[in-house]
From Swiss-Prot:
Its main location: plastid. The keyword Nucleotidyltransferase does not apply. Belongs to the roaA family. Keywords: Chloroplast, Plastid. One of its GO terms (cellular component) is chloroplast. InterPro entries: RVT_N (IPR025960). The protein migrates at 80 kDa in SDS-PAGE gels. The gene is roaA. It is found in: Plastid, Chloroplast. It comes from Euglena gracilis. This is Ribosomal operon-associated A protein.
Length: 516
């Protein structure tokens, strides 16, 4: 068998012929599924699953869709060897060699088990995907093993789901333990012996791609079942995570209809639900827990409550970037931190206390940078470090660095003031004050007073004379004037000079009763 592979070169294959053959076969399977001819679909899919075109198509896509698998590292012999093992006679997964596969291929210099697993996943995908109409993005993690050429964004799922006002959930929903496997054996278009080896509870192997395909196969046709039997016009949305099943609907009187639909639909699939569903929840009053997040709808916005573990994990990642950074290039470090901050903000986190949360993250990041810069310039004073790395820009103290080699300058991005964070799903933007101080919030008054002392000479000469005569204090409240919101009053005492008739007060102290 190995001598046969030496005669061929992987690069000389006519891939146009392979792509056209695979596309034509998938289109025939799709047309047969529209006619509801199950036996014809199973016959075509079994032939396509055993064909040489499907095997070589899956191995090629394995290298293209996973860039970490460098194609030049594998020879043509290795790739054709994978193609031969995907055949029905030599397929390791079809014959149940789940536990001995790693031991059998330990002598290979590359991770053969991972490569074979990905190729087999894509083979199942290309074979079964044309038959499944309702592709439900229930499994967010590792879903790319199943859906070929499609990526379901988690934010887009939330946008669609949160259009609905109510939901109910079914817990401890393990369909592999509730299902009667006879329905799956009869309708699932794969070898029966292979399914028996996989679905056997004694030898159950959690092979993710096949698990997802069986799941979507069981739920296939749920939307059509709704619209045909119960005359519901809107689309059905449901999510499935581990052992929890969530179902979403618009109106409260649809709850009993949806409950009846689910029980009758699953009974046709051989799944008997013995769980009582007696209550439903509203998004505005009950938190929707999915994955490790808690969601709540507030008006037109989706609010996300970020738990403490999430914040601690993100802080730890920032700390590891700063602490494990071995180079002395602060410019490169700030660039890495900016990418990390953008990656965090692009997730679209929404919570009630977003200002306090992101202010806390900014302060934590500035403390990390202060310790790093202090170690980098151990002989320099604090004043020198502040003047070199922190600049007052647009009313905010920001970390600033200049690259000496290229002359480029870079500001450290902020969690709180980043424009990419303040958005909603309806493009509603939020505005915040530019006078807030992030770096030293407790000395905000001293900072404003210092800035005022620096720029007070740019005002009119009359103001400077009054300011110096009153020693920078208001005439009434005797508090400092370090704001541009002040008033100059003429008390009209003709016995005095011109400047003695004028007083400088705060705008809120402008009470003429106090002049009497």
């Amino acid at each position: 068998m190995f001598s046969f592979f030496y005669r061929f070169n992987w690069n000389f294959i006519k891939w146009n012929l392979v792509d056209n053959t695979v596309s034509l076969t998938q289109h025939k399977i799709y047309l047969a599924s529209k006619k509801s001819d199950i036996f014809l679909v199973k016959n075509k899919q079994r032939r396509f699953f055993k064909s040489f075109y499907a095997h070589i198509f899956s191995v090629r896509n394995c290298f293209e869709k996973f860039p970490s698998l460098q194609s030049y590292f594998y020879s043509s012999k290795d790739k054709f060897f994978l193609v031969s093992l995907l055949s029905s006679k030599r397929n390791l997964f079809l014959h149940g060699f789940f536990y001995n596969i790693k031991k059998a291929f330990l002598f290979y210099s590359y991770d053969f088990f991972l490569l074979y697993k990905l190729s087999f996943s894509l083979l199942l995908t290309s074979t079964l995907l044309p038959y499944i109409n309702d592709i439900n993005p229930c499994f967010i993690k590792d879903y790319y093993f199943f859906v070929e050429g499609n990526f379901f964004d988690f934010e887009q799922i939330l946008i669609d789901v949160f259009k609905y006002s109510y939901y109910f959930k079914v817990e401890n929903f393990k369909f592999l333990y509730f299902a009667r496997f006879s329905w799956i054996y009869k309708n699932f278009p794969l070898d029966v012996n292979f399914l028996k080896n996989f679905l056997d509870r004694k030898n159950l192997v959690f092979f993710k791609s096949l698990f997802l395909i069986i799941f979507n196969f069981i739920f296939n046709g749920l939307n059509f079942f709704f619209q045909e039997n119960f005359f519901i016009s809107y689309k059905v949305y449901y999510l499935f995570y581990i052992d929890k099943f969530y179902f979403f609907f618009k109106f409260p009187y649809d709850f009993f209809i949806c409950k009846k639909i689910i029980i009758s639909f699953f009974s046709l699939r051989g799944i008997i639900l013995n769980i009582n569903i007696n209550s439903f929840y509203r998004f505005e009053t009950f938190v929707f827990n999915f994955f490790i997040f808690d969601f709540l709808r507030f008006g037109s916005n989706i609010l996300l409550h970020i738990n403490k573990k999430h914040i601690q994990f993100y802080k730890l990642s920032l700390k590891m970037i700063v602490k494990m950074f071995l180079k002395k290039s602060v410019f490169f470090l700030v660039n890495l931190l900016n990418k990390k901050i953008l990656d965090c903000l692009n997730r679209g986190f929404f919570c009630f206390n977003n200002n306090f949360l992101f202010l806390e993250l900014d302060l934590y990041l500035y403390r990390l940078l202060w310790r790093y810069i202090k170690k980098l310039h151990s002989r320099k004073t604090r004043t020198w470090i502040y003047s070199k790395y922190w600049k007052f820009f647009s009313g905010i103290w920001r970390f600033f660095i200049t690259d000496i080699k290229t002359g480029n300058f870079l500001f450290l991005k902020s969690h709180l003031y980043s424009s990419k964070y303040f958005y909603s799903y309806r493009n509603m933007k939020f505005k915040i004050s530019n006078t807030l101080n992030i770096f030293n919030l407790y000395n905000k008054g001293k900072l404003e007073r210092m800035i005022f002392e620096k720029f007070k000479y740019k005002f009119s000469p009359n103001f400077i004379v009054l300011y110096n005569n009153q020693r920078g204090l208001c005439f009434f409240c005797k508090k400092s004037i370090y704001s541009n919101r002040f008033v100059i009053l003429n008390i009209k005492k003709w016995n005095f000079s011109f400047f003695e008739n004028l007083i400088l007060i705060h705008f809120y102290c402008n009470n003429f009763n106090q002049l009497q």
